[in-house]
Every structure is written in structure tokens, then in C-alpha cells.
């Protein structure tokens, strides 16, 4: 009986330990692993709002450039490259979730016209595969194959991302036509400042929640600070919690105002969006254009030959 109770106790301890470990893992790493563009996928049915704004800007507050390059025109059922460039200073280091410094990651969302989608592996040429590297793209939703996301991936290696795209064929997709279409892109480097629930990340400026005198600053063992602010008028105390990462700007005994920055801004990244246009070209129109050019060239040749023939006739008449 005692052996059975001992076994039950050991089993309970093991179960409790596993549960605690799992909770610690979720609390510690969830903000890191659920990085862009996963947040957008979880919170928004469509990444592009009616205003044209891409929702990634809700969490990545700094504005940074992004560039996209696509062919001017493509034929139906053809694989082509969409190259997204996310430039930034490779020497920069960002504040990680644990407060330490590390390299920047990048991510991108590519919003293609309806019918355009990620090219299947067997249609991608070796040249494009080499440019892609080890990237793994995914659809924003199973029902939205024209919206592709990637990231976070190391910015040092993938500040230029090549998407392999398959153009649609109007012969098999009746809702697709030979037209000029817009393509939208959003790209960011570095961690965001706001989580989807509205809470601030440690990649942010922290401001004073009250005015008064900084009476005490406690540096936490695992990083970060507890700042006690005392209102000189009524003696009320307010404690502001600063997570690991941002650098402190105030000191004990200093008089501060409401919303005054207590820390520096550690953010070195940001988000940008852009657009491009692509024409889905009708092969018959291309053939017609080539035929027209060929006919013009032939007409020019015939005119030159006719002119030379006429000159020979004139020359022979003059000699006669």
C-alpha cells in the first residue's frame, strides 16, 4: 500500500513538474515564437485594410523603406520572380525579449492579384531555387493562396527575398483576365513595439505614469527596473515597471513630469509597404505584335530593294 502511495506521489510530482515547465516555456517564449507575420494571420482576415494600410504597421510603429521588383509583363501559366528588398544597417543590434542584444529578423507579406499563387516546387527553375535559399513560404489563409507570408528569418541572410510566383491562365480560370494588376508588399525588420493584445513589448519607450520625484530605483535580478515616483503634493506613490532591454534615463531624486520618457527608445527596426504593377499578357496579342513588327521590317526591306532596282534602271537609261 505504501509503495502504491509512493508511486502516486512520484507520478504527481512528475506531472506537476512537466506542467510548470510547459507554463514557463509558454510565458517565456510565446512573444518570441509568435512573431510577425503570425500575429497578423491570427488577428486579421485580410492583411490589407480598406484604406490600403497593411496591418503589420499596427505593431511595428517605425516607418522604414521596402522595395519590390517584378516583371513588367508575364504570360499565362508562367513562373516568375517577385523580389522584395528590406534594407537596413547590418551592424545594428536589436533588443530581444530577454533584454539581451541580437541580430534583426525580417519578414514580409506579398499580396498578389487573385489567381496568382506560390509556384509549385516542380515548376521552379534551379536559378530561382538558388536565389530563394532555404526559405519556406506559406499562404496567409488556406483560402487566400494569392497572399504569401514569410518570416521571421535572419536579416543578415535574407534582406532580399525572392518569391517564386505562378501566373494564372485565363483559359482555365474564367475569373482571370488579361489586364494590368496591382501587387502590394509589406516588409519589416526587427521586433514590434505592440503585441496584438495592445500590451507593449520591451522594444519600446517607457514613460512615467505619474508626475513627481523619483524616490527609488530598484534594479531587478533578471534585468529591468522598478521605479517609485512620489507625488510631492499628496505623497502618493506610483511604481513603474521597466522590463529588461531599454536603457534608463532618470535617476533617484530627479523631478519628472507625466509621460516623460523614463527610458531610451531601443527600437532600430520598422515596417514599410510598397506596390508594383504587372500585366498578364495575352500570347495572341504578343504574336500579333511580333507579326506586325515582322511585316514592318519586310516592308522596309522591299522598299529598299525596290529603290535600288529603280536606281539601277535610271542608271542604265542614263548610260544608254
UniProtKB/Swiss-Prot annotation:
Cofactor section: heme
Intracellular or extracellular location(s): Plastid, Chloroplast thylakoid membrane
Gene Ontology terms for molecular function: electron transfer activity; heme binding; iron ion binding
Positions of heme binding: 36, 56, 59-60
Secretion signal, residue range per the UniProt entry: 1-35
Biological process according to GO: photosynthesis
Cofactor binding note from Swiss-Prot or TrEMBL: Binds 1 heme group covalently.
Segments crossing the lipid bilayer: 286-306
Topology of this chain in the membrane: Single-pass membrane protein
SUPFAM superfamilies, A to Z: Cytochrome f subunit of the cytochrome b6f complex, transmembrane anchor, Cytochrome f, large domain, Rudiment single hybrid motif
InterPro entries: Cyt-f_TM, Cyt_f, Cyt_f_lg_dom, Cyt_f_lg_dom_sf, Rudment_hybrid_motif
Alphabetical UniProt keywords: Chloroplast, Electron transport, Heme, Iron, Membrane, Metal-binding, Photosynthesis, Plastid, Signal, Thylakoid, Transmembrane, Transmembrane helix, Transport
PANTHER family: CYTOCHROME F, PTHR33288
Protein family membership: Belongs to the cytochrome f family.
Function: Component of the cytochrome b6-f complex, which mediates electron transfer between photosystem II (PSII) and photosystem I (PSI), cyclic electron flow around PSI, and state transitions.
Record note on quaternary structure: The 4 large subunits of the cytochrome b6-f complex are cytochrome b6, subunit IV (17 kDa polypeptide, petD), cytochrome f and the Rieske protein, while the 4 small subunits are PetG, PetL, PetM and PetN. The complex functions as a dimer.
Protein name per its UniProtKB record: Cytochrome f
Organism this protein belongs to: Cucumis sativus (Cucumber)
Amino acid at each position: 500500500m505504501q509503495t502504491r502511495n509512493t508511486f502516486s506521489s512520484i507520478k504527481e510530482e512528475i506531472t506537476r513538474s512537466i506542467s510548470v515547465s510547459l507554463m514557463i516555456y509558454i510565458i517565456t517564449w510565446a512573444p518570441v515564437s509568435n512573431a510577425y507575420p503570425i500575429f497578423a494571420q491570427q488577428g486579421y482576415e485580410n492583411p490589407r485594410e480598406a484604406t490600403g494600410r497593411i496591418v503589420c504597421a499596427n505593431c511595428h510603429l517605425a516607418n522604414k523603406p521596402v522595395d519590390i521588383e517584378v516583371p513588367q509583363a508575364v504570360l499565362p501559366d508562367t513562373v516568375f520572380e517577385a523580389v522584395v528588398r528590406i534594407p537596413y544597417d547590418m551592424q545594428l543590434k536589436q533588443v530581444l525579449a530577454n533584454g539581451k542584444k541580437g541580430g534583426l529578423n525580417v519578414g514580409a507579406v506579398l499580396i498578389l492579384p487573385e489567381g496568382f499563387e506560390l509556384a509549385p516546387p516542380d515548376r521552379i527553375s534551379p536559378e530561382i531555387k538558388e536565389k530563394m535559399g532555404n526559405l519556406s513560404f506559406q499562404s496567409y489563409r488556406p483560402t487566400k493562396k494569392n497572399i504569401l507570408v514569410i518570416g521571421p528569418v535572419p536579416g543578415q541572410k535574407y534582406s532580399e527575398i525572392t518569391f517564386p510566383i505562378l501566373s494564372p491562365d485565363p483559359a482555365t480560370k474564367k475569373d482571370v483576365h488579361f489586364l494590368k494588376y496591382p501587387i502590394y508588399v509589406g516588409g519589416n525588420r526587427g521586433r514590434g513595439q505592440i503585441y496584438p493584445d495592445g500590451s507593449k513589448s520591451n522594444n519600446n519607450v517607457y514613460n512615467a505614469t505619474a508626475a513627481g520625484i523619483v524616490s527609488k530605483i530598484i534594479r531587478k535580478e533578471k534585468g529591468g527596473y522598478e521605479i517609485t515616483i512620489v507625488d510631492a503634493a499628496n505623497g502618493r506613490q506610483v511604481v513603474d515597471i521597466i522590463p529588461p532591454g531599454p536603457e534608463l534615463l532618470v535617476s533617484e531624486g530627479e523631478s519628472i513630469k507625466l509621460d516623460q520618457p523614463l527610458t531610451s527608445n531601443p527600437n532600430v527596426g520598422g515596417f514599410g509597404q510598397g506596390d508594383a504593377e504587372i500585366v498578364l499578357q495575352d500570347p495572341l496579342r504578343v504574336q500579333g505584335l511580333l507579326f506586325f513588327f515582322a511585316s514592318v521590317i519586310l516592308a522596309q526591306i522591299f522598299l529598299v530593294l525596290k529603290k535600288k532596282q529603280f536606281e539601277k534602271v535610271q542608271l542604265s537609261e542614263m548610260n544608254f
